[in-house]
């Protein structure tokens, strides 16, 4: 049986700062970009990543999953933490200590199970303070990886000064203007600021409720934006 460290070294490839992310792009950039293009093909691509070189500009941290020697899943993050995030001054300040934001998640065709491995670990590890904005199918995928919905008031503080429009009555979904189009999103993650119990998990009924809302709002967005 393989040791855990051996398994991790064989399957996980990480970049923990701009310099190491840049090295990952030098080595795996074509695969990373192809996977991101595939993952975001239904929504016109990933915002801000139009070529592989853009990955370095968007990501402060990257995690790749390698299966049988090939990169099959990509997760990119922006570091939104304050340099002194652990101090009492900033620990509970959502406007300064904003955790680690997911900026892109994708898997190559038929390999979503490996992206799920990355996200399940991230949403389980509370100290990572991982969160992201999701809509439509991506919202359901994140929920099934253990992400917890974040109330609008907390999401708005974290996203400040970006403006929220049409805050939905459910208390979680909101609409933002992105490149001239209205997009309804839900923020989800595991951040302690969100006042979730560490052991809290959504029921299947909860997941289905949020899934139905995500699909409903995505359909409304398509009509509104004439897609």
Spell out what each predicted region is.
Residues 4-18, 78, 82, 129-227:
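Terminal substrate-recognition subdomain of acyl/acetyltransferases
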Residues 52-53, 116, 120, 139:
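Short amphipathic alpha-helical segments and helix-helix/interface helices
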Residues 59-60, 125-128:
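Short, high-confidence coil segments that cap the C-terminus of an alpha-helix
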Residues 43-67, 71-100:
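A conserved beta-strand-loop-helix scaffold within acyl/acetyltransferase catalytic domains
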Residues 107-124:
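Conserved acetyl-CoA-binding loop-helix of GNAT-fold acetyltransferases
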């Amino acid at each position: 049986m393989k040791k855990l460290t051996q398994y991790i070294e064989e399957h996980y490839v990480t970049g923990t700062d701009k310099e190491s992310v840049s090295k990952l792009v030098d080595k795996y950039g074509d695969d990373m970009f192809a996977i991101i293009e595939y993952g975001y093909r239904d929504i016109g691509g990933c915002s801000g990543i139009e070529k592989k070189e853009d990955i370095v500009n968007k990501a402060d941290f990257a995690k790749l999953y390698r299966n049988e020697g090939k990169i099959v899943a990509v997760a990119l993050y922006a570091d939104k933490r304050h340099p002194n995030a652990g101090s009492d001054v900033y620990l509970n300040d959502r406007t300064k200590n904003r955790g680690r934001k997911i900026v892109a998640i994708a898997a190559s065709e038929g390999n979503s199970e490996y992206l799920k491995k990355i996200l399940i670990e991230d949403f389980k590890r509370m100290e990572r303070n991982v969160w992201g904005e999701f809509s439509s199918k991506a919202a359901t995928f994140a929920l099934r990886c253990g992400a917890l919905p974040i109330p609008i008031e907390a999401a708005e503080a974290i996203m400040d000064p970006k403006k929220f429009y049409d805050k939905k009555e459910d208390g979680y979904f909101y609409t933002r203007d992105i490149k001239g189009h209205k997009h309804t999103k839900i923020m989800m993650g595991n951040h302690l600021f969100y006042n979730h119990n560490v052991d809290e998990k959504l029921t299947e009924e909860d997941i289905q409720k949020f899934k139905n809302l995500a699909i409903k709002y995505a359909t409304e967005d398509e009509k509104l934006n004439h897609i």
